[in-house]
């Protein structure tokens, strides 16, 4: 079978390599060198880490929503939501924005921001500092009328309790209060979870899954090839991209807090087996 090794990224280490760059709409890729890191391929785009201040160009993404996670600093998101003027949203460290597919948007930051983005390609951009990108693009927004999802991740995590003793047979009712749906994202959802124990084997049929370890540690077990499942130890500040269709599960002895961008539909195995290929699976 084709190798499906996950991408494992130490986000904190990658951020430490970057320097803050003051952007303008005319800034080129060469200008921003050293302030942007390509972390991994993800679905039809890239995971990026960015340190920037100033005013970015207007852009829009044609194939899917963009995920923006502010890790440090503050920013203002300007976005075209409908036929009216662009709207502004203040973002601070610990907040997430899901920017709808096709929506013109840009970020401004006076003092600087550090962020991680999941950015789909291709896209359009405008390298001029204008109040409304439609004055340059010449195309109406149409019947978009879609607002971005703005999530205060720290506030959402504070609502959750650690679920200890999780097993592959644990139900949604068992897990109530330990997991929360943050927002819709592409063909699935953003979720946050706190648990200790062992999750079920699962496989996502529509695309890669993005995992961000926010606190604690966990072991990712994943079927990468024809051999036995491989194990990867993840700690706070690390990211994993689980390839589309790859069977995987997590276990954590002391507890882990994680955020996921999970596509649907999925298949799951609610038995504690060493290899999911030996068991019957169900559609979730």
Describe the function of each predicted region.
Residues 58-61, 65-70, 88-89, 107, ...:
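His/acidic/aromatic-lined binding-pocket segments of jelly-roll/cupin-type domains
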Residues 82-101, 224-244:
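Short acidic-glycine-tyrosine-enriched beta hairpin
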Residues 54, 63-82, 197, 206-225:
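Glycine- and acidic-residue-biased ligand/ion/polar-headgroup-sensing regions
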Residues 49, 77-79, 117, 192, ...:
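Short hydrophobic/aromatic-rich beta-strand segments that constitute the beta-sheet cores
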Residues 46-62, 189-205:
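Conserved short histidine dyad/triad with adjacent acidic residue
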Residues 1-50, 132-193, 280-284:
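A short, N-terminal "cap"/entry segment at the start of jelly-roll beta-barrel domains
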